[in-house]
């Protein structure tokens, strides 16, 4: 939904690296093309004990055995990752930029965000609290001396992050 996914098929594997804080992420300096950062996880180098941290939090199958059925879980760590992970915050911001490019009308932005992420229009109640969230976030951003256009985008990014964190989005398809 962020519009960042690279649909390039084939090519070399994407290397991972361990950061000083213990997180394992994509090794951006080793990429052949900047867009390779957004390739599907299928192209990540697979090692038994060296997996992308974000995927391991969300029940990535163990590479040391066959996986005929994926387990699902709900854990506090997943919620914390969804709220604070840099990658996910970047995706919410990219999602907001994608929506913002389409229209300036707040109601249409809300509807588009719901359609892109959840495949449906928001209910009246969802549309109402989404408008309230946008208005409140814009005011909060403006209080920090942010330019109005930036405040608008940051508020939309907050809405997009909220939609991406919804239970409905996590279980799409």
Would you name each region that the model predicts?
Residues 140-165:
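Charge-dense polyanion-binding interfaces
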Residues 1-117, 121, 158, 163-173:
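An acidic, gly/pro-interrupted, aromatic-rich
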């Amino acid at each position: 939904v962020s519009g960042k996914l690279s649909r390039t098929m084939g090519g070399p594997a994407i290397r991972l690296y361990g950061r000083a804080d213990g997180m394992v992420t994509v090794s951006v300096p080793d990429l052949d093309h900047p867009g390779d950062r957004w390739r599907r996880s299928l192209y990540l180098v697979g090692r038994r004990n060296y997996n992308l941290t974000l995927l391991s939090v969300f029940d990535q199958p163990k590479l040391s055995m066959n996986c005929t059925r994926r387990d699902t879980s709900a854990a506090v760590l997943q919620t914390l990752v969804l709220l604070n992970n840099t990658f996910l915050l970047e995706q919410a911001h990219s999602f907001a930029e994608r929506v913002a490019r389409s229209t300036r009308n707040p109601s249409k932005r809300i509807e588009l965000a719901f359609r892109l992420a959840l495949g449906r229009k928001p209910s009246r109640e969802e549309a109402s609290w989404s408008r309230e969230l946008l208005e409140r976030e814009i005011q909060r951003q403006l209080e920090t001396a942010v330019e109005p256009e930036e405040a608008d985008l940051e508020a939309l990014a907050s809405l997009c992050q909220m939609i991406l964190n919804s239970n409905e989005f996590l279980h799409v398809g």
